[in-house]
């Protein structure tokens, strides 16, 4: 029987090609970015303006391209981190993070009425506070290059639209809790009634 000769090398996506594709997407969507290095890993940093619920109405994001995967982190600016640092309610914040990480499963969408692809739960980001005394609140997810190769547009939309939108939506309960204006129970109630449907999917 004749063997089919597939070129598996053509299907492999490495860190440099992944970075090239992301940059192409950012340029096409007019998303400002800067390039750099984190150790030996190429890095792209982006700024999202118009995030109405966030400190200074901005969010920042970095994508790190490691040898076997990429990691995307979305986080508040330095003023947001300062609010975390001076807060006396961080223990309550960690309880809220526990709820969010257990119950929220963001669903990526194309933003044009499902004409390009159907909504899917592609990635499972986690929300945490960094342990480096910077007090950053970070929403992070890991991207497998092979999966990115299979679902490129879905992945790019998720990293640059879905994740920032989710953190922006969570900002009101997060910072009201940090400022001592509401309880953990009230923060959870806000998320359940204004952000989630009954399946844990973003409204």
Where are these regions (language model features)?
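A short acidic/glycine-rich loop-to-helix N-cap element
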Residues: 146-161
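A conserved amphipathic terminal alpha-helix motif
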Residues: 158-177
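Beta-strand elements of well-folded, non-transmembrane domains
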Residues: 50-52, 78-80, 143-147
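Short, internal acidic amphipathic alpha-helical interface segments
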Residues: 75-136
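Long, low-complexity, intrinsically disordered polar/charged segments
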Residues: 1-24, 28, 74-97, 176-187
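Charge-rich, low-complexity N-terminal segments
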Residues: 1-74
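Short, aliphatic-rich beta-strand segments
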Residues: 137-141
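Short, highly charged C-terminal tails/helix-capping segments
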Residues: 175-203
């Amino acid at each position: 029987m004749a063997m089919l000769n597939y070129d598996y090398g053509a299907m492999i996506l490495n860190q440099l090609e992944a970075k090239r594709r992301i940059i192409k997407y950012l340029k096409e969507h007019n998303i400002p970015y800067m390039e750099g290095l984190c150790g030996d890993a190429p890095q792209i940093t982006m700024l999202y303006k118009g995030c109405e619920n966030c400190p200074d109405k901005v969010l920042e994001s970095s994508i790190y391209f490691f040898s076997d995967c990429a990691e995307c982190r979305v986080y508040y600016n330095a003023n947001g981190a300062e609010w975390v640092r001076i807060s006396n309610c961080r223990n309550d914040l960690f309880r809220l993070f526990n709820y969010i990480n257990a119950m929220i499963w963001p669903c990526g969408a194309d933003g044009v009425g499902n004409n390009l692809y159907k909504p899917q739960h592609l990635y499972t980001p986690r929300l945490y506070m960094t342990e480096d005394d910077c007090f950053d609140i970070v929403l992070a997810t890991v991207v497998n290059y092979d999966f990115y190769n299979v679902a490129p547009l879905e992945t790019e939309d998720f990293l640059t639209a879905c994740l920032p939108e989710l953190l922006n939506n969570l900002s009101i309960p997060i910072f009201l809790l940090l400022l001592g204006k509401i309880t953990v129970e009230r923060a959870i109630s806000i998320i359940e009634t204004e952000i989630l449907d009954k399946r844990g999917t973003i409204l």
